[in-house]
């Protein structure tokens, strides 16, 4: 089964077109094929993405079966993961039995139900068939005497690259040889920061630059270079010619392109991301495929034509018979006594109840157990909303799962109310920090910025700050320049050795003290002056996006965010907008620990901009006219939650009213205890950390500053649910840092627009994060990025294992694994729980086709809690 057969009906229409039409539609063909890979962002702005985002029109089960066939990639949890989860009480057997019964009811078979159930029960133990049984002469002789099952013949339509079917004289698979060449060209073209001597003609595009150099490539043989000597000048022509000379039928070309894209999904993903960033490179995926398949032709041409380029693949009945012998307790003698019809029925049943089906039932039981446990946690807390304590401060945190423990401990220690909101606070902005010539899109990667906000300072103070920055940057620039120069690179070790040697020793043995000293030194040296923002709209034709906001836009963004969390009345004297950031050393994945809603950056900038907008008199007056009355003595401030050390760093505190100052002092007084408790809870979950922690905060700082620490924090591992509702629904619940929490009051959302926005924005971000962790756990060899300790940071783009691997797209082993054999992250698809009446959910599903498709196809799970507290699974 090819993904071509399940992606779209458009693809099927192209099967009968001739070569001229095929060439004309090459853009469409490549675009359709590109759905099998996901765009890969550079590691410096690591953005959560899930690798199957282009395949959500198919069910999770269909994609799982296709990947198993096409790439031998299993995206269901392994047997060891399932057994471990069951041993820890994460899977209830009753849910597995319900799932099995439902599956049997959906199947058509003509064997006794009791026989089928007995077979399935044994098969669900997930034991491997003994190799001695599979290789036994008796079994193989029996298989020869039995004809193939009628439905067992299937065509392998996944169209593996021809190079993967051939080995050279050295025994090397030619697909590995091809990958080696393609990795080299990708590194040369995509390198933005590593080399001082860039690829010639790079500005003309990948294909033109490659075409200019390929005939001089010493890594190719004379005959291989000869094939490419008079090759077409344009990528589309080259791709069409290569496919034709390889003998790929027009009806199979999309499947063939898919096979090549999946051969190096990391590099192909980076190519696809680049193609989406500018019009200049929008044809980059076609260029990549043209280079790859042209080189494939040059490498495999001596071996063409192949006799069995696309052979029919038959289902071996040996493991099917063995499964009935081992799990169904049917002897070989009993097999021989059966009629051909009975044999065919048994084999067909075993074929349908394959490994993927068994693991699917286990995964669903695991997910249902989690949902039931979450339901019990929520329903066990009977809260009296009319008995609320007096609130002196309200704090809005990002929905990030790491906020949940911090919020829980903060609420326990004082009269505080917390809210959950996407960490960009609904501001579609690109941020430009003081002195920076570049801007960073500080919003979810699924959105595009509409405004640019610049950080500004007094001219004299800014000049002083710039001078200090230049001194700091000149040191690193000089070091980098000397390292790349032929002559000075030999002198560099002598010059820098003593200083770097001292740094290595001190950072290795006293990391917390030295790291803190260096951090404070840089902080003092590069202390920013007092800054403001370019909040007012400026029409600048030189900028791609406008600077600042109009008055209407200011009011609109504040109104939207306040309504989204239900904060439109009963304002506390102090309202704190809390972005979040991480703190780690020598960590290429630092951006993965930052705010996903801010495009892999810290959320403090957005928090400060939003708080500043809320304090503007013009904004408050306009909101008051609409019925959102913010008291004069209510002050908005901004802070940053540092997730690695669980501290709150104040970044914007304007002049406070008396009541707001009292609230501020109250927060400050409890914050050390909040940090201690949150750090204690978090640190005990780290592997090999079973000792009693005397000073959790001190230990957390050591993890953050230790440059040999491969796991400064767990990040968003174990995320499993996204709860959309009022805080009373989850207050006092220990959700174990596994839930994204977004405030929502359905009573303030009569038309459902707020709920739709939450699902389309934060809901999508949470789903991408969830499935990225899922994929990196179940298939780390394909969707993960291996061990941090052996990674190589490449061209400022990402990481590789060694210098000739795929660009690794997922999370490292240390982000999801407790040990070599034990996972920390539970690979469950995201459960979205919405607190709203049933009619709200029905309206959402009717209006949002994309979300309905995700639910129906098994990419997310959905449940709701109505006004009476009744839980419903959708």
Curated annotation (Swiss-Prot):
Cofactor(s), by name: Zn(2+)
Topology versus the membrane: Peripheral membrane protein
GO cellular component, as recorded: plasma membrane
GO MF annotations, alphabetized: zinc ion binding
InterPro entries named among the record's database cross-references: DabA
Subcellular location per the Swiss-Prot or TrEMBL entry: Cell membrane
Binding residue positions for Zn(2+): 398, 400, 580, 595
Signal peptide start and end residues: none
Keyword entries, A-Z: Cell membrane, Membrane, Metal-binding, Transport, Zinc
Purpose: Part of an energy-coupled inorganic carbon pump.
Subunit structure, interactors included: Forms a complex with DabB.
Family as reported in the entry's similarity comment: Belongs to the inorganic carbon transporter (TC 9.A.2) DabA family.
Record-given protein name: Probable inorganic carbon transporter subunit DabA
Organism in which the protein naturally occurs: Bacillus cereus (strain AH187)
High-level lineage: Bacteria, Bacillati, Bacillota, Bacilli, Bacillales
């Amino acid at each position: 089964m090819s993904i071509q057969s399940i992606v779209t009906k458009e693809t099927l229409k192209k099967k009968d077109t001739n070569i001229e039409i095929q060439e004309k539609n090459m853009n469409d063909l490549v675009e359709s094929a590109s759905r099998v890979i996901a765009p890969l962002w550079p590691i410096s702005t690591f953005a959560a993405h899930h690798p199957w985002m282009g395949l959500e029109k198919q069910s999770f089960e269909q994609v799982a079966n296709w990947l198993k066939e096409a790439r031998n990639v299993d995206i269901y949890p392994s047997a060891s993961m399932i057994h471990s989860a069951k041993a820890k009480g994460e899977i209830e057997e009753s849910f597995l039995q319900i799932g099995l019964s439902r599956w049997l009811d959906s199947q058509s078979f003509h064997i006794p139900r009791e026989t089928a159930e007995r077979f399935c029960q044994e098969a669900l133990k997930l034991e491997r068939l003994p190799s001695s049984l599979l290789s036994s002469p008796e079994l193989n002789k029996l298989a020869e005497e039995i004809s193939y099952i009628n439905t067992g013949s299937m065509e392998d339509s996944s169209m593996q690259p021809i190079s993967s079917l051939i080995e050279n004289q050295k025994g090397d698979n030619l697909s590995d040889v091809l990958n080696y060449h393609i990795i080299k060209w990708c590194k040369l073209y995509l390198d933005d920061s590593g080399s001082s001597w860039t690829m010639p003609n790079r500005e003309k595009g990948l294909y033109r630059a490659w075409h200019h150099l390929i005939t001089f490539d010493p890594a190719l043989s004379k005959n291989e270079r000869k094939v490419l000597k008079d090759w077409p000048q344009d990528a589309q022509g080259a791709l069409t010619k290569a496919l034709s000379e390889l003998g790929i039928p027009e009806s199979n070309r999309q499947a063939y392109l898919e096979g090549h894209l999946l051969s190096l999904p990391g590099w192909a993903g980076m190519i696809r991301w680049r193609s989406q960033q500018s019009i200049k490179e929008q044809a980059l995926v076609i260029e990549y495929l043209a280079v790859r398949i042209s080189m494939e032709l040059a490498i495999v041409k001596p071996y063409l034509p192949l006799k069995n380029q696309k052979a029919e693949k038959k289902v071996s009945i040996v493991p099917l018979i063995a499964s009935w012998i081992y799990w169904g307790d049917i002897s070989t003698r009993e097999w021989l006594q059966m009629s051909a019809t009975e044999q065919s029925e048994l084999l067909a049943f075993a074929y349908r109840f394959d490994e993927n089906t068994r693991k699917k039932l286990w995964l669903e039981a695991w997910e249902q157990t989690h949902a039931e446990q979450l339901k019990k946690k929520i329903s066990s807390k009977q809260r009296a909303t009319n008995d609320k304590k007096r609130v002196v401060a309200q704090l809005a945190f990002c929905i990030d799962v790491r906020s949940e423990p911090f919020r829980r401990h903060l609420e326990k220690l004082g009269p505080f109310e917390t809210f959950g909101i996407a960490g960009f606070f609904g501001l579609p902005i690109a941020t430009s920090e003081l002195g920076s010539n570049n801007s960073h899109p500080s919003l979810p990667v699924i959105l595009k910025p509409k405004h640019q906000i610049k950080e500004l300072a007094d001219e004299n103070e800014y000049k002083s700050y710039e001078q200090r920055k230049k001194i700091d940057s000149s040191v690193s620039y000089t070091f980098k320049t000397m390292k790349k120069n032929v002559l000075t690179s030999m002198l560099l070790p002598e010059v820098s050795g003593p200083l770097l040697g001292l740094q290595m020793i001190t950072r290795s043995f006293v990391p917390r003290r030295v790291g803190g000293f260096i951090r404070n030194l840089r902080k003092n040296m590069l202390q920013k002056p007092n800054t403001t923002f370019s909040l007012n709209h400026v029409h600048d034709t030189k900028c791609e996006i406008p600077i600042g906001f109009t008055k209407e836009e200011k009011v609109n963004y504040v109104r939207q965010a306040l309504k989204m969390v239900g904060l439109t009345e009963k304002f506390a004297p102090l309202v704190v907008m809390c972005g979040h950031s991480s703190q780690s050393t020598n960590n290429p994945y630092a951006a993965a620990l930052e705010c996903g809603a801010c495009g892999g950056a810290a959320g403090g900038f957005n928090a400060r901009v939003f708080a500043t907008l809320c304090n503007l008199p013009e904004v408050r007056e306009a909101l008051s006219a609409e019925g959102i009355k913010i008291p004069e003595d209510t002050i908005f401030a901004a802070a940053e939650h540092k997730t690695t050390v669980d501290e709150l760093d104040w970044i914007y505190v304007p002049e406070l009213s008396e009541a707001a100052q009292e609230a501020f002092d109250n927060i400050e007084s409890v914050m050390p205890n909040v940090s201690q408790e949150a750090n204690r809870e978090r640190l005990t979950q780290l592997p090999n950390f079973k000792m009693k922690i005397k000073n959790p905060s001190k230990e957390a700082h050591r993890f953050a500053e230790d440059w040999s620490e491969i796991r400064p924090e767990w990040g968003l591992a174990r995320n499993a649910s996204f709860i959309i509702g009022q805080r009373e629904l989850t207050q006092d619940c220990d959700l174990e840092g596994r839930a994204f929490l977004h405030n929502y009051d359905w009573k303030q959302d009569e038309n459902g627009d707020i709920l739709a926005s939450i699902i389309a924005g934060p809901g999508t971000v949470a789903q991408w994060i969830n499935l990225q962790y899922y994929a990196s756990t179940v298939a780390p060899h394909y969707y993960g990025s291996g061990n941090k300790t052996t990674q190589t940071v490449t061209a400022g783009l990402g990481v590789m294992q060694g210098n000739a691997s795929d660009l690794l797209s997922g999370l490292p082993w240390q982000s999801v694994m407790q040990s070599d054999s034990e996972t920390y992250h539970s690979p469950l698809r995201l459960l979205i729980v919405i607190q709203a009446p049933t009619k709200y959910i029905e309206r959402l599903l009717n209006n949002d086709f994309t979300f309905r498709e995700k639910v129906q196809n098994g990419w997310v799970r959905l449940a709701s809690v109505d006004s009476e507290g009744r839980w419903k699974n959708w």
